[in-house]
Amino acid sequence: MRGFGSDSSQASGEEAKCPVNHKTRELWLHQARAAQSASTSAAPALPQSVQVAPASQPSQPSSYSSSSWSSWLRIPFFSQQSQSANSTQQAQPPKLSAPLLDETRVISSIPRTPDATPSACPVNHEVETGASPTGHWVYPSEKQFFEAMRRKGYDPHAADMKTVVPIHNAVNERAWAEILQWEAPYVEPVSKGGCGGPRLHSFSGLGTQHMSPRARINTLLGYQAPFDRHDWVIDRCGKKIEYVIDFYAGRSDGGNAGKLNFYLDVRPKLNSWEGFKMRALRAVGLS
């Protein structure tokens, strides 16, 4: 979930000014490795593409189960190559070179505010090389993700990027889909003078040391703590709306070996009258 923009090097003094949690990538890498570990114990399967879809009710506190704004991600991961692979390929000696990292950057479906100005602390807390001509945020490539983690003192494996980057992209897309559901009742179409819909203005990863009030209360009640938190600022036709997103690692069942479940709890912050109003109207079914 870290950084949509490019992540090239920057002076340490400037980087220290940004309120970014450098452990965020490591958190997601840990989740990815856990899924890969589970997949190695399962029967070999053909590679599957990343899928993002709502699943059954989560095994979280009752307040989560009844939350219409919460959703699951069930992401299948690549298992080892099928045992029926060509024998001549299996006989080839292992390559000594490290896996090549893809430099392709995927354009997200998330529009960004056009007035985001460059600064020592960019709105996405990464060093940017500019927005896509489409006006949407751009996801980092495998190489950018890998180099950013290594530069910040972690020990990433190039092979992990094949898993981490799809997780990063899929979870961002799901979070944005949830925000669009929240925003739908308040957005006017362009034909009626609207601005065309909300845009993502900025975001930041706060990690687990800054738990949201809901997450803290449920953790005190004995429920699972989130493994990450992000705050997103949405531009709704000139009005800034803040959202909080808690990320939970879902419990996998016996039939989903090699798959990693994510539970996203997305809602407006209660730090403004607009946030209170949106959550109250949703609670009584009026939005």
UniProtKB/Swiss-Prot annotation:
Enzyme type, top EC level: lyase
PROSITE patterns: CYTO_HEME_LYASE_2
EC number of the protein: 4.4.1.17
Family per similarity comment: Belongs to the cytochrome c-type heme lyase family.
Organism: Chaetomium thermophilum (strain DSM 1495 / CBS 144.50 / IMI 039719)
Biased amino acid composition, Polar residues: 1-12
Keyword match Magnesium: no
Protein's recorded name: Putative holocytochrome-c1 synthase
Cited InterPro entries: Holocyt_c/c1_synthase
Its job: Probable lyase that catalyzes the covalent linking of the heme group to the cytochrome C apoprotein to produce the mature functional cytochrome.
Region (Disordered): 1-63, 81-100
Bias-annotated ranges (Low complexity): 31-63, 81-92
Keyword Transcription included in the entry's annotation: no
